[in-house]
């Protein structure tokens, strides 16, 4: 049991970034562009563009919109991520981050294992999920790894628009 607790501590982030805002839930965020209009409310459909990186494990991208993916130049076909805010379809960090944004805004978030993270017992259960096989391999290698690697993730999120569901 002691070894399990030690493993848990090693998979959690050790860094609080001073130029990021830290929320009571543990989410760290930094706004690059504020956007305009009203912030989305629970129950509304949100449409976002996002990038994801394994910040705690060599900074490897696992989702990069508008960039070459796996050697294929497929950035022209944009499929945005859509979900109902507060529905539980995605990790809690996405709901919390987007709820505080305005359309057109860009926010960077740092997410560590905890209540806002992918479930460690079944990380494939919640999104966001990479759109490519190589992206899935990069993300799930980190999330499903039983070793002592830092599972911290970094996401860049752009709120494209908000719609009534």
Predicted regions and their residues:
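Cross-family detector of peptidyl-prolyl cis-trans isomerase
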Residues: 1-165
